[in-house]
Amino acid sequence: MEDIVIVAAARTAVGKFGGSLAKTAAPELGAAVIKNLLERTKLSADQVGEVILGQVLTAGSGQNPARQTTIKSGLAKETPALTINAVCGSGLKAVMLAAQSIAYGDSEIVIAGGQENMSASPHVLLGSRDGQRMGDWKMIDSMIVDGLWDVYNQYHMGITAENVAKAHGITREMQDALALASQQKAAAAQDAGKFVDEIVPFSIAQKKGDPIVFSADEFINRKSNAEALAGLRPAFDKAGGVTAGNASGINDGAAAVMVMTAKKAAALGLTPLGRIASFATSGLDPAMMGMGPVPASQKALARAGWKAQDLDLLEINEAFAAQACAVNNAMGWDTSKVNVNGGAIAIGHPIGASGCRILVTLLHEMQRRNAKKGIASLCIGGGMGVALTIER
């Protein structure tokens, strides 16, 4: 098989829940990123053969949000698009599907990634077509039901984090320490301008005055400290350790990469950011979903012929500090190389986009450090994991 490479990678800044991006539809965010990828590569709109984007919360979003993104971005109307839902792994799974599409000759150039506006996800009145003759009638929160709820055990994702903490001996103190480190690393990276190259400035129209340009992650909590974290109440289990401070956020954003063969990149005069060395998807007990990166990373590393110790840089999504700690312990990799610019606890977790967001951040940091081998991995609600390795 020909080498498959990524030639461009970009994302929006991540918005907080109800924040700067709250009123911007997910396809608008994705379209801004796609336009930027074309600018970075200087390719014309009709050269892109396919678009594959993750989006988890699609209730009320209209048909095939990825297709909406494709049209809004100015790509040719002949360019097909696919929206996928692999929950938190959607954005990375989209890149895997892009590689497969190229490998089998279905497309030459694919844009893949994810988009999400969690703030805009609607409340839904189930059964409204038939009506409710008697009794209370309750609306459901589609964000929680479709994005954050374990349908198999009928509890919130936060309980799965508590399950992992209990099974793997992860204390509240360990969780808070990882969360604080994530905030500090993200703030330092932002101050140093490390996210500038990967972020696409996004213009937000205002009712009065000039548009606001949104270009910096707004969820990072610079006031976070050990005392404040320790003072937070457990969010899901009174005797547990998972809090609002050591869990990822509810966020909005988009990210995408451009994928093609190394031969095609050379023909177009494009320098690859990295080669996709391998990828893998795994399944496990839904109650322990936070451990998903372990089997997925093990499979991806084996397929690449690597060991965990060979990795120069790692982006392992921080759904919860509890599972992030447990995954680090289980894999035994060098934690000083993990999420060096902070993770989802600080930056945020727009679920359909996060898989590609961590890949974008990984690719740019690998360039900065001249790192040779990297991995991106996420746990997935429902009991799965995804991982993808990059070589430069």
Which residues does each predicted region cover?
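Conserved active-site "lid/cap" helical segment
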Residues: 1-61, 65-73, 80, 160-172, ...
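Condensing-enzyme catalytic core mediating Claisen C-C bond formation in acyl metabolism
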Residues: 1-24, 36, 226-291, 295, ...
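N-terminal extracellular/periplasmic Venus flytrap/periplasmic-binding protein-like
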Residues: 11-12, 22-32, 40, 174-267, ...
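Beta-strand segments within the central parallel beta-sheet cores of soluble alpha/beta enzyme folds
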Residues: 46-54, 80-85, 110-115, 174-181, ...
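Conserved catalytic cysteine-centered active-site region
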Residues: 55-109, 152-156, 223-249, 330-357, ...
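Active-site-proximal alpha-helical scaffold in enzymes
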Residues: 84-116, 159, 165-194, 256-263, ...
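Flexible glycine-/small-residue-enriched beta->alpha junction loops
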Residues: 109-163
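Active-site pocket-lining segment
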Residues: 159-162, 195-198, 206-207, 277-346
